Swiss-Prot record:
NCBIfam families: dxs, PRK05444.2-2. This is 1-deoxy-D-xylulose-5-phosphate synthase. InterPro entries: Dxylulose-5-P_synthase (IPR005477), THDP-binding (IPR029061), Transketo_C/PFOR_II (IPR009014), Transketolase-like_Pyr-bd (IPR005475), Transketolase_BS (IPR020826), Transketolase_C (IPR033248), Transketolase_CS (IPR049557). One of its GO terms (biological process) is 1-deoxy-D-xylulose 5-phosphate biosynthetic process.
Length: 637
């Protein structure tokens, strides 16, 4: 680690406030260097944090945290906040099992005012805190820090609309770096970008009036000044929109300040001190650069949004001399991306929709090959789903590529706008199940439960990569709303067909014949079920579909076996195991059933294999649980 004499003095914001304001730029440099080194070792969100260093220092320098509340939106940019609030020596554990969470977490620190992981929640949460303080007679201040990408979500504007009508002391800091994870899309980011240059017409008139007479007396000066004036007028035409930023937020009832350089920490301190003394809703528009201070991240903030590990800058810029690695087995996301392009090449009706997750959802190639049929709607999951419904009404075949955890945000639209109207929209539900380092806010553990109760829905869960392609093709051709949910990362390594074969909807398949015990497995749990079944001589059914579920297969297995074990990487409550129990009850079958899924708990973060073992869903844990269950039953009999 590089020496950091100022940063080493800081264990809390109280220590930070003892520094002279002129020392803060140096502190920012030390903090940024520390970030480069710590994230380089552990991995994690990177470019967003580099861009928020000065802003974080200034906020903690001015505001009396933890008494005053800082509410970070999404949390990608919260690492400097964690470093300054007593967690610097734990940063090497970031996103690791038993270590620091990658996002603000209330149970981790009193400085983490609100837990977060999804976008656009900060203004509403900070507004609630400000309203509570008013009712309690407290003079605490609440601050929401939100990126311009998160401002594309309707929830942010719902909160702005509400806040402007309430007499509360609230500061919203708009951290404008023209990025979310991918480049921002939509009218609002363009609107904000047009307002970075301030209105210069008044300034130009003043300069001309004051200096015109002097310039007339200097040979050649007037001609030069006229050229400068032309350049300024060109900028001024764009800057006419600057007044609109003020108008936009002031029409919501906020007093607008900005844009302000988000990397000038001393000026930020002065501005924030002024804003802290003001009453009522305030909005500070700060301009930052994602990846600031690390050229590779500045030049490619999408690639460096999050990193597994960080090469030295000099090494990263050199051509690799290593032998190319053999091609790894494809991830489920890559299987989906290839299927989508193959299907689109054969069907001009196919359109793809993503809520600001082009890279993560595997849509980069699709956008390049079919730009007219690609729609990135921004961080707007609700709109994405209803938009897909409108496309389906006119004969298009929409495919919504979305993470399981983000589909939760559009549940009403899925029910009201898609399912009740039986519109043929396919949801490619990525990151189903445990996701690892991102933790509980990003885990996809509830989709089977909340999808299978929705009328008209088809819900499928592939057990390997080829099954993923089969089920995508099958559900795409269904004249009904459908969801195919698949996990993060790679699968079993099954060879993937290039064809568009389909399977019968609502029918499972026996993967292994055994005796006495039947494993009824869904999706990613088929592989561990097969591993355990080899040791216990059990039958394994790959159900493929959670809805419609294969009642005939379940009844046949129940009548030909002594006991049943269901396995799913989803919440036990309301999940696929519950669907099996419903079938047994419907047919009056009473057999011992062991449900294996995620218990009613908040999961942790870290290595997915370790998390699955803790949840009792790794192959080793499944074997232990099943053997213990069988032993208990034998003892009882």
């Amino acid at each position: 680690m590089n020496p950091s004499p100022l940063l080493d003095l800081i264990d809390s914001p109280q220590d930070l406030r003892r520094l002279d304001k002129k020392q803060l730029p140096r502190l920012a440099g030390e903090l940024r260097t520390f970030l480069l080194e710590s994230v380089g070792q552990t991995g994690g969100h990177f470019a967003s944090n580099l861009g928020a260093v000065e802003l974080t220092i200034a906020l903690h320098y001015v505001y009396d945290t933890p008494e005053d509340k800082l509410v970070w939106d999404v949390g990608h940019q919260s690492y400097p906040h964690k470093i300054l609030t007593g967690r610097k020596n734990q940063m090497h554990t970031m996103r690791q099992y038993g270590g620091l969470a990658g996002f603000p977490k209330r149970c981790e620190s009193e400085y983490d005012a609100f837990g977060v992981g999804h976008s656009s929640t900060s203004i509403g949460a900070a507004l609630g805190m400000a309203a509570a303080d008013k009712l309690l007679g407290s003079d605490r201040r609440s601050v929401a820090i939100i990126g311009d990408g998160a401002m594309t979500a309707g929830q942010a504007f719902e909160a702005l609309n509400c806040a402007g009508d309430m007499d509360v002391d609230l500061l919203v800091v708009l951290n404008d770096n023209e990025m979310s994870i991918s480049p921002n899309v939509g009218a609002l980011p363009k609107y904000l970008a047009s307002n970075v240059v301030r209105d210069m017409h008044g300034l130009l008139s003043t300069v001309k009036a004051q200096t015109g007479k002097v310039l007339d007396k200097i040979p050649g000066a007037m001609e030069f000044a006229q050229k400068v004036e032309h350049k300024i007028k060109t900028l001024a035409e764009e800057a006419e929109h600057a007044k609109q930023s003020l108008s936009l937020f002031e029409n919501f009832g906020f007093r607008y300040t900005g844009p302000v350089d988000g990397h000038n920490v001393e000026n930020l301190v002065d501005v924030l001190k002024d804003l802290r003394s003001r009453k009522g809703p305030q909005l500070l528009h700060v301009i930052t650069k994602k990846g600031n201070g690390y050229k590779l991240a500045e030049n490619d903030p999408v690639k460096y949004h999050a990193v597994a590990n960080l090469p030295k800058e000099s090494a990263a810029q050199m051509p690799s001399e290593k032998e190319p690695k053999p091609a790894a087995k494809p991830t489920y996301t890559q299987v989906f991306g290839k299927w989508l392009c193959d299907r689109a090449a054969a069907d001009s009706r196919l359109v793809a929709i993503t809520p600001a997750m082009r890279e993560g959802s595997g849509l980069v190639e699709f956008e390049q090959r079919f730009p007219d049929r690609y729609f990135d709607v921004g961080i707007a999951e609700q709109h994405a789903v209803t938009f897909a419904g409108g496309l389906a009404c006119e004969g298009m075949k929409p495919v919504v590529a979305i993470y399981s955890t983000f589909l939760q945000r559009a549940y009403d639209q899925l029910v009201h706008d898609i399912a009740l109207q039986n519109l043929p929209v396919l949801f490619a539900v990525d990151r189903a199940g445990i996701v690892g380092a991102d933790g509980p806010t990003h885990a996809g553990l509830y989709d089977l439960s909340f999808l299978r109760c929705v009328p008209n829905m088809i819900v499928a869960a592939p057990s390997d990569e080829n099954e993923c392609r089969l089920l995508l093709s099958t559900c795409y051709q269904a004249d009904a709303p459908a969801a195919v949910r698949y996990p993060r990362g790679t699968g079993t390594g099954a060879p993937v067909s290039d064809g568009m074969e389909t399977v019968e909807i609502g029918k499972g398949i026996i993967r292994r014949e055994g005796e006495k015990t039947a494993f009824i497995a869904f999706g990613s749990m088929v592989a561990p079920a097969l591993a355990v079944a080899e040791k216990l001589n059990a039958t394994v059914a790959d159900m493929r579909f959670v809805k419609p579920i294969d009642e005939e297969l379940i009844v046949r297995l129940a009548r030909s076996h002594d006991r049943i074990v269901t396995l799913e990487e989803n919440a036990e409550q309301g999940g696929a195991g519950g669907a099996v129990l419903e079938v047994l009850a419907k047919h009056g079958i009473c057999k011992p059933v062991l449900l294996l899924g995620v218990a009613d708990t908040v999961t942790g973060h870290g290595d997915p294999k370790k998390l699955l073992d803790d949840l009792g869903l790794s192959a080793e844990a499944v074997e232990r649980r099943v053997r213990a269950w069988l032993s208990d039953r034998d003892a009882a009999n």
